[in-house]
Amino acid sequence: MSKVLVFVGGFAAPGNEWPLTPIRRSAREQGWRTKYFDERLAFGPLATSAERLVKLIDELDQTHDTIVVIGHSMGGLVAEHAAALGAPIDGLVTIGTPHQGHNLSRFGPLPVMREMGTNSAYLRGVAAIPGERPPILAVVAANDRLVSKSAARPNRPHTLLEVPNVGHLRVIFDQSTADTIMKWADALTDEIAERHQDLDRATRSERGPNSPPATS
């Protein structure tokens, strides 16, 4: 199966950190294509970034069977919003993401900071969007001084990974974090492949035993 891992960086992330992470290295070693979402609108509305991410995911969906998105910090909010808008994301990983908001006023009065604020209208609006969403792995850094453990937990069912002895930035360079994320992503890929096989068997059963496999 063709599979791609999309990384969405945090606030004002330069993008050059992604190629250096063990997540990317492990993903490529395990046969995943990797893509960095080049977010040049980091200081603009999060909704604009989410819409741009939806467009990218739609394009990748034409050539890949499995799409997993990893969002670090603010990038996780953008990814969750894209999923809520119906982007064909199979799995979502958020790392140090302020799902419950945070008091970031010390970073200045930028509109994006207000959107990430505790109980903000933006966060409430995304949570209220109806529809199914992909499985989510929420990664929490034990020594994160920007996003608390409670703030990093999504408002919906999720798998939680708490990483000891690392902070908000260091967590994406932690090998054990990368290993767990890739194990989770590979298990998700296996589930998707099994569903495709079940669908193919059901389709062939309806058409007759000598019918060719269904094409997607």
Regions found by a protein language model. Give the residues of each.
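C-terminal catalytic-base region of ester-bond hydrolases, centering on the histidine
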Residues: P130-S216
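Residues at the C-termini of beta-strands that transition into short coil/loop
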Residues: G9, D38-R40, G96, V140-A142, ...
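Serine-dependent carboxylesterase/thioesterase catalytic core
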Residues: K3-G9, A13-W18, P22, S26-F37, ...
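Class I (Rossmann-like) S-adenosyl-L-methionine-dependent methyltransferase catalytic domain
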Residues: M1, L41-A47, R195
